[in-house]
Structure formats: C-alpha cells, structure tokens
C-alpha cells in the first residue's frame, strides 16, 4: 500500500510524456477532421454556372463577379492550416472566404472544376490571377489530362 507508481528505467517518464503528447495530437487532429465525416462534409461547395454564377457554401455565397483570386492552399492563421488545405477565395472588396475541404478534394479535381465551370465566367483579373499560379507547361499538362481523362 505504501508503494506508489514505480518505473523500470529513467526513460519511462519520457515514454509517458511522449504518449501524452501523442494522445493530445491525435485528439486535436480528430476534432479538426471530424466534420468531414458528418453531413457537413458531404457537399463542400456548389457551383451555379453562367455569367451570373455563384459558388454556394453552407450559409453564404460568392458571386463570380466578386472573385479576385481563387486558389487551394493552407490557411496561414489557424492551427487547422497546418494539416488541411482549404479553398481560399479573395473577393474584390478585400474579404477572404475560406472553404474547408479537410483534404477530401484533391488539387487536380479542384483545378478541373475551376477550369470547366468557374474560370470562363470570372472577370479578367481573376482569370489572370488563376492562370498565373501555374507555369505554361503545368497548365497545358493538366488541361490535356482533363481532356483525356475527365473526372467531372
């Protein structure tokens, strides 16, 4: 009864500390990714095509005419940005709209959706911003891939 917790070696405390840190890390990443497995993760965004098109999110929408820059990247001001890429839309009024993807959408699939349904209806500045993200060789390669093996 007088004996408390005993360790076999000096490294046991390191193992215990490492295990606790790993559990905390696992819980944090689980709670960040959990929405992807709920009804919230079923539809990430919806596109209404055409000149008056919109990108619909859960509770808001962004008109194509308001888009200044559109890209898939890491949100730099959040812990979630370390683990997951988001779709980031910079609007002409300076506001930023972030669409969480939980890494469900791959970059080529997102590029194809933008090229087919969004890019033709964006303003000239937004089109130039989209095209300037890639070298000419990269863009030709993925456009050829979309023509040969469409996923959408």
Swiss-Prot record:
Keyword vocabulary terms for this entry: Membrane, Transmembrane, Transmembrane helix
Topology within the bilayer: Single-pass membrane protein
Coiled coil: none
Organism of this sequence: Bacillus subtilis (strain 168)
InterPro entries: DUF5381 (IPR035324)
The protein's name in its UniProt record: Uncharacterized protein YfjE
Annotated GO CC locations: membrane
Disulfide bridge map: none
UniProt-annotated location(s): Membrane
Pfam families: DUF5381
Protein origin, superkingdom: Bacteria
Keyword Transmembrane in record: yes
Transmembrane regions: 12-34
Protein family: To B.subtilis YfjD.
């Amino acid at each position: 009864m007088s004996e408390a917790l005993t360790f076999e070696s000096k490294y046991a405390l390191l193992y215990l500390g490492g295990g606790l840190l790993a559990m905390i890390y696992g819980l944090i990443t689980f709670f960040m990714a959990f929405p992807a497995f709920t009804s919230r993760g079923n539809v990430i965004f919806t596109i209404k095509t055409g000149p008056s098109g919109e990108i619909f999110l859960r509770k808001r929408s962004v008109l194509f005419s308001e888009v200044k820059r559109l890209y898939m990247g890491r949100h730099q001001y959040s812990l979630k940005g370390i683990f997951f890429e988001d779709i980031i839309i910079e609007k002409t009024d300076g506001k930023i709209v972030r669409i969480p993807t939980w890494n469900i959408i791959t970059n080529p699939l997102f590029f194809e959706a933008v090229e087919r349904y969004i890019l033709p209806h964006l303003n000239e500045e937004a089109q130039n911003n989209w095209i300037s993200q890639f070298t000419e060789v990269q863009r030709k390669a993925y456009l050829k891939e979309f023509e040969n093996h469409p996923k959408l």
